[in-house]
Design a protein with these regions (language model features):
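N-terminal beta-strand-loop-alpha-helix module at the start
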Residues: 1-64
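Short phosphate-binding loop-to-helix
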Residues: 70-92
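A glycine-rich helix N-cap at a beta->alpha junction
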Residues: 70-75, 126-129, 155-158, 164
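Short glycine-rich or small-residue beta-strand-to-loop segments that form or flank ligand, phosphate
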Residues: 72, 98-103
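Class I SAM-dependent methyltransferase SAM-binding "motif I" and its flanking Rossmann-like core
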Residues: 119-147
Length: 178
């Protein structure tokens, strides 16, 4: 089960992101509150819109209601972010993979929080990824991952919680053996 969550962060190239979503073969598309504005701009009809709905344009809410999109409205004052609520729903839907779109840009605190959500998702046993026009962000925890790219692509490996151990990088300009 593969789920796309569209957030309210920065999306500058709607054509590119729309093609990523269409090629993603997602089982569900969920909008985290204002992410519905982005979905609307890309002519995407999500399966769910979740949050306090304080960032969604009113006419977009009405449009998606007419399209029978499922809404889950929550109070503004709550313990979880709108995106955490989307992740909880994804978990209930038995997601094996979650891709976050629109998770970067805008407020730096939101960007950092969204990157930290990768760890939160991974701890649930779900494989997460952030996708933007410029980068893809993964998290690896005691596992092997394969990243495909082209000559000239930039790859950064950053330890988040502790020192990275057992890291081997092959077929790169700067290979690494633990």
């Amino acid at each position: 089960m593969k789920i796309c969550i569209i957030l309210n962060g920065e999306i500058k190239n709607y054509d590119y992101i729309n093609s990523v979503i269409l090629k993603g073969s997602y089982d569900y598309i969920i909008c985290s509150d204002g992410g519905a504005n982005h979905a609307y701009s890309m002519n995407i009809v999500p399966d769910y819109i979740i949050g306090d709905l304080d960032s969604v344009n009113g006419n977009i809410i009405e449009y998606y209601k007419s399209k029978k999109v499922k809404f889950e409205k929550f109070p503004t004052k709550k313990d979880e972010t709108d995106t955490e609520l989307c992740i909880e729903l994804s978990d209930k839907l038995k997601a094996k993979e979650i891709h976050l779109i629109g998770a970067l840009g805008g407020r730096i605190d939101h960007t950092i929080a969204n990157i930290n959500l990768l760890y939160y998702i991974r701890k649930r046993g779900i494989t997460p990824k952030i996708i933007s026009e410029k980068e893809e962000i993964y998290i690896a925890m005691d596992e092997e991952i394969t990243i495909y790219g082209e000559i000239g692509d930039i790859i950064s490996i950053l330890p988040i919680k502790n020192d990275a151990k057992g890291v081997t990088l092959n077929n790169l300009e700067y290979p690494l053996e633990d």
